């Protein structure tokens, strides 16, 4: 019974003892198996508990505690099992089991390894149990043959029936092999099972090496944790490959002692060069030291002649150093001298000020007023007027105009175009004889004419020009509508070097023989696109055709030669110079430029037709006059914007109505439109400029060229009919580098300009495009239409002369 318990459980029968051999008289019975050879171990099965009689005696029960006996003793209350408590605990256990538990990478690896180890152990046990089963189910004859001491098998039948195993070697080798096995007393291998003549290795066990275990672990990690995404690339390793073929000595460089005893290493030779010679890789400090050392050597050798030569060498080194630093990139263009500026510096300079030029032989812009090339007397007036830094159009246009080149300037409103053509004009006429020198010279007309689209712009240019002409002794006269011809003829009695006029009134004066242009050699067209929009193309052509042709420039490459164009024709006259300034370039303006300008240089500041970057554009969709008036009152009463404020409308009769509404709200207002006389216009502008009036209500008449300082807000009560008019309306604010706001009221009648308005607002960095305009159907594509009809106020100013 003890043997049964120790060797295995009752469920698995222990190996049976070998049966007795068959009784044959001639063959002696086989000896019994040796006890030293142990049978194969049974599978690891949990042993059953021993029978009750074999168990040790149980320990004595503990002595019961003395309980209180008597009337004070309490009976223990029976506590029934709480079903709710069990259900609650079960739910908590289920919830805890269902809740995902975070496992770190190390824990996941450990769990995977443990799981794999268990699988390997189970597989090993399964193989061991299969081997035991096969050994237990062997026939008694085979078992007796294997366990025989001398290894000789006892024949149990014919040889054909006894050779159940497939021979794997010659008989001699098989006998010696089995003999050695029996001599080592190792357990016999289990018999191989035959399956279709092929040996199966299911029951065989082979030793597993460490490399295979590591490979299996790596596969498990890759299966459960994914492939390793960490890159093993190393730039250092890649660089180290180049040193594989480098020969390394057995000693270090620190062990070199040749410098201690060899004088060649103690006194190294210094390379001395004469003149501009330099050693490759030496810096300027080393070159300076070499030059100074050589100069001292020359001076020590010959104090008189060597000193002169030493100073020449030092001066030569200084010039060489300046020449070398000229091409360095370490300084900004503002820190360099003019002669040290390179092409790259000029390109950066133009990008900083958003300047682009076209045309042959265009000079570089000026960085400051000191580089403008203006005469000293004119520079003093520039400083006196208060021009501190030139604007971008002034930086680019003045150097070109000073070379007697024809010029087309494309710039936004309020960019300082007036000074950019006035200053070169004064330099030009200063080289001509004085107009009051002879009586006949007074009657031949002015030296220069300046054309402006509106009276207000012409008078504004006149005020700006007199700041320079009066100290220089030049006479400036403005010829505009609204004044009598007799008054203007009286102004011309003493002659004038410069005449500033509107095209219509100037044509009237020419046709009335009040004025001739026999000696006019300088023509300026300011706001040329606006003049074309107002229908002044024909008057402009008449004026330009009335100019003399004797001093006209040739239409060839010679017109780009500044030296040839600056020379006098004959003894007194000079080549005619024509300048055109505009904000946009419509087809009609290009047609005039091709006809009357000779090889012009084109200067563009920013992009043509874009709004000023200093103006914040706001758009509000408001339908109906009453709602717009209410919104206008809210804006003016908010106190957010300081006067002066300009309100633009499209129809003249709306000006007075809106002005009356503004006065009822407690603000002072004036109107400016074509029905006003010249005196009324001048008085209205003067009141706004002086700060006496808060709000100016105007039509597009004031949309171009009117410079009212410090306008904080422009309100488009009615949207302009064209995007060009809108651009010049909002250009009344944000001038001279200051910021401003433009608010536009939109309605369904403005669908023709919604697309262009959307594009302009999108290009502005400080403006926000409203969602309603962005999604509006009319703003999705450019409308295909003809020329917009002009308002009555745009085509004429309402006065009798028409201009």
UniProtKB/Swiss-Prot annotation:
Residues 135-146 have a biased composition (Polar residues). It is found in: Cytoplasm; Nucleus. Its EC number is 3.6.4.13. It catalyses: ATP + H2O = ADP + phosphate + H(+). InterPro entries: DEAD/DEAH_box_helicase_dom, Helicase_ATP-bd, Helicase_C-like, P-loop_NTPase, RNA-helicase_DEAD-box_CS, RNA_helicase_DEAD_Q_motif. A motif (DEAD box) lies at residues 526-529. Transmembrane segments: none annotated. Residues 115-126 have a biased composition (Basic and acidic residues). Residues 11-62 have a biased composition (Pro residues). Residues 614-777 form the Helicase C-terminal domain. The keyword ATP-binding applies. ATP binds at residues 411-418. A motif (Q motif) lies at residues 367-395. PANTHER family: ATP-DEPENDENT RNA HELICASE DBP3 (PTHR47958). The Q motif is unique to and characteristic of the DEAD box family of RNA helicases and controls ATP binding and hydrolysis. Component of the U5 snRNP complex. ATP-dependent RNA helicase involved in mRNA splicing. May destabilize the U1/5'-splice site duplex to permit an effective competition for the 5'-splice site by the U6 snRNA, resulting in the switch between U1 and U6 at the 5'-splice site. May also act to unwind the U4/U6 base-pairing interaction in the U4/U6/U5 snRNP, facilitating the first covalent step of splicing. This is Pre-mRNA-splicing ATP-dependent RNA helicase prp28. It comes from Aspergillus oryzae (strain ATCC 42149 / RIB 40) (Yellow koji mold). The gene is prp28.
């Amino acid at each position: 019974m003890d043997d049964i318990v120790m060797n295995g459980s009752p469920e698995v029968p222990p190996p049976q003892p070998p049966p007795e051999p068959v009784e044959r008289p001639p063959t002696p019975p086989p000896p019994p198996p040796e006890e030293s050879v142990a049978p194969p171990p049974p599978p690891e099965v949990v042993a059953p508990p021993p029978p009750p009689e074999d168990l040790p005696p149980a320990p004595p029960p503990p002595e019961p505690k003395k309980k209180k006996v008597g009337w004070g003793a309490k009976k223990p209350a029976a506590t029934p099992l709480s079903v709710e408590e069990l259900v609650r605990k079960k739910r908590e256990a289920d919830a805890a089991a269902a809740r995902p538990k975070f496992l770190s990478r190390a824990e996941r690896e450990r769990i995977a390894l443990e799981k794999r180890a268990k699988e390997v152990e189970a597989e090993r046990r399964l193989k061991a149990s299969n081997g035991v089963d096969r050994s237990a189910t062997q026939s008694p004859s085979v078992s007796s043959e294997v366990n025989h001491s001398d290894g000789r098998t006892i024949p149990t039948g014919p040889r054909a029936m006894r050779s159940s195993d497939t021979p794997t070697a010659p008989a001699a080798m098989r006998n010696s092999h089995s003999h050695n096995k029996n001599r080592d007393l190792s357990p016999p291998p289990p018999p191989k099972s035959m399956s279709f003549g092929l040996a199966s290795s299911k029951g065989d066990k082979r030793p597993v090496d460490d490399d295979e275990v590591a490979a299996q672990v790596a596969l498990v990690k890759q299966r459960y944790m994914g492939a390793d995404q960490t890159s093993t690339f190393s730039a250092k390793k890649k660089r180290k490959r180049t040193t594989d073929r480098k020969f390394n000595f057995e000693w270090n460089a620190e062990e070199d002692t040749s410098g201690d005893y060899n004088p060649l290493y103690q006194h190294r030779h210094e390379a001395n060069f004469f003149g501009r010679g330099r050693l490759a890789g030496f810096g300027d400090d080393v070159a300076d030291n070499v030059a100074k050392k050589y100069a001292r050597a020359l001076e020590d050798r010959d104090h008189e002649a060597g000193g002169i030569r030493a100073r020449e060498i030092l001066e030569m080194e200084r010039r060489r150093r300046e020449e070398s630093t000229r091409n360095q990139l370490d300084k900004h263009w503002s820190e360099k001298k003019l002669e040290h500026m390179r092409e790259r510096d000029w390109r950066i300079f133009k990008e900083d000020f958003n300047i682009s030029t076209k045309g042959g032989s265009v000079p570089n812009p000026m960085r400051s007023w000191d580089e403008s090339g203006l005469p000293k007397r004119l520079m003093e007036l520039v400083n006196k007027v208060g021009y501190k830094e030139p604007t971008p159009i002034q930086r680019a246009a003045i150097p070109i105009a000073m070379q007697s080149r024809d010029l087309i300037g494309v710039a936004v409103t309020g960019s300082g175009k007036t000074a950019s053509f006035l200053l070169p004009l004064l330099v030009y006429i200063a080289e001509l004889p004085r107009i009051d020198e002879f009586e006949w010279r007074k009657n031949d007309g002015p030296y220069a004419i300046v054309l402006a689209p509106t009276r207000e712009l012409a008078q504004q240019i006149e005020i700006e020009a007199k700041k320079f002409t009066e100290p220089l002794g030049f006479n400036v006269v403005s010829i505009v509508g609204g004044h009598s011809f007799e008054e203007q003829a009286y102004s011309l009695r003493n002659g004038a070097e410069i005449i500033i006029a509107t095209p219509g009134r100037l044509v009237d004066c020419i046709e009335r023989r009040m004025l001739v242009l026999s000696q006019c050699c300088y023509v300026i067209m300011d706001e040329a696109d606006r003049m074309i929009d107002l229908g002044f193309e024909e008057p402009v052509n008449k004026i330009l055709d009335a100019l003399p042709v004797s001093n006209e420039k040739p239409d060839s490459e010679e017109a780009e030669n500044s030296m040839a164009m600056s020379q006098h024709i004959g003894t007194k006259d000079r080549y005619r110079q024509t300048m055109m300034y505009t904000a946009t370039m419509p087809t009609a303006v290009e047609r005039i430029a091709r006809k009357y300008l000779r090889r012009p240089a084109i200067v563009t500041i920013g992009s043509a037709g874009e709004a000023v970057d200093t103006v914040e554009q706001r758009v509000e969709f408001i339908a109906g006059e009453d709602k717009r008036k209410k919104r206008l009152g809210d804006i003016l009463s908010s106190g957010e914007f300081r006067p002066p404020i300009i309100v633009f409308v499209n129809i003249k009769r709306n000006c007075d109505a809106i002005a009356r509404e503004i006065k009822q709200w407690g603000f002072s207002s004036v109107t400016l439109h074509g029905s006003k006389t010249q005196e009324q216009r001048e008085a209205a502008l003067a009141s706004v400029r002086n700060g006496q009036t808060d709000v100016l209500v105007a039509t597009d008449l004031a949309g171009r060229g009117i410079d009212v300082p410090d306008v904080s807000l422009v309100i488009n009560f009615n949207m302009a009919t064209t995007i060009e008019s809108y651009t010049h309306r909002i250009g009344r604010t944000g001038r001279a580098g200051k910021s401003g706001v433009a608010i536009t009221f939109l309605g369904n009648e403005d669908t023709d300009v919604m697309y262009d308005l959307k594009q302009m607002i999108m290009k502005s960095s400080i403006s926000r495009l409203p969602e309603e305009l962005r999604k509006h159907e009319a703003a999705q594509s450019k409308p295909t239409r003809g020329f917009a009809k002009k308002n009555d106020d745009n085509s004429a100013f309402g006065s009798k002369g028409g201009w």
